[in-house]
A protein has these predicted regions:
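N-terminal localization/anchoring segments of enzymes in phospholipid and broader phosphate metabolism
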Residues: 1-216
């Protein structure tokens, strides 16, 4: 059994914000260490320039989760922390409810799902004041922010500060609070709004490429 490795982008104690401001970083679990995610949140919790943290949590690892602890520390340090916690996650309902209660008791704003939908997206966005403007740093993943399952499940997380992507991540979080208004997406594929059409379009494109003898 091999131990997970650190990502080379984050060696030598470099700031997550300094790295992600310059380039996107793709993490591949369980081969990369999941510690990168709670470490990113810990840095955000103590960074004086960070004003807000928004995150979706589908399955709480435990009541002593490093993710929960980092978010609570951020709230204690005066950050505005919003957590979309899906209490309908199968077999984890009780654990998630307890997690929601703990977060609320520490001043975290908790949204317990969206009426009529199950939120399965894995998103986090940190807002930071830089040079008189607000810059956003997002993580978009296929797997839960869960340090236990990250050891055995194969997943990816993209860390990015690209404005065209982070703006649409903000649209998603705004929808969680005001779900009467459905945003339009250009970069993100978001169910149940545009995923079917987006995937059909991509399939048709590859069919067309194959017919023309192109790589498909």
């Amino acid at each position: 059994k091999l131990a997970p490795i650190p990502h080379p982008a984050f060696t030598n104690g470099r700031s997550f914000f300094d790295v992600i401001a310059k380039r996107d970083v793709l993490l591949h679990f369980p081969y990369h260490s999941f510690n990168i995610i709670p470490d990113f949140l810990r840095e955000a919790a103590i960074d004086q320039k960070v004003t807000k943290i928004r995150i979706t949590i589908y399955r709480v690892a435990s009541q002593n989760s490093s993710i929960l602890n980092a978010l609570i520390n951020a709230a204690r340090n005066g950050k505005q922390v919003t957590v979309l916690l899906e209490i309908l996650a199968r077999f984890d309902e009780e654990n998630n409810i307890l997690g929601a209660e703990r977060l609320r008791s520490e001043g975290v704003h908790v949204i317990v799902g969206v009426r009529g939908l199950k939120v399965h997206g894995k998103l986090c966005i940190v807002s930071r004041k830089e040079h008189g403007k607000v810059r956003h740093y997002a993580t978009i993943g296929t797997g839960n922010f869960n340090e236990d399952t990250a050891k055995i499940y194969t997943d990816h997380i993209l860390m990015t500060s690209a404005p065209e992507i982070t703006q649409e991540v903000l649209y998603v979080f705004n929808f969680f609070k005001n779900n009467f208004k459905v945003p339009r997406f250009r970069e993100l594929i978001v169910s149940p709004f545009n995923s079917r059409d987006a995937f059909l379009e991509k399939i048709k494109r590859e069919i067309s490429n194959a017919k023309k003898g192109r790589r498909a």
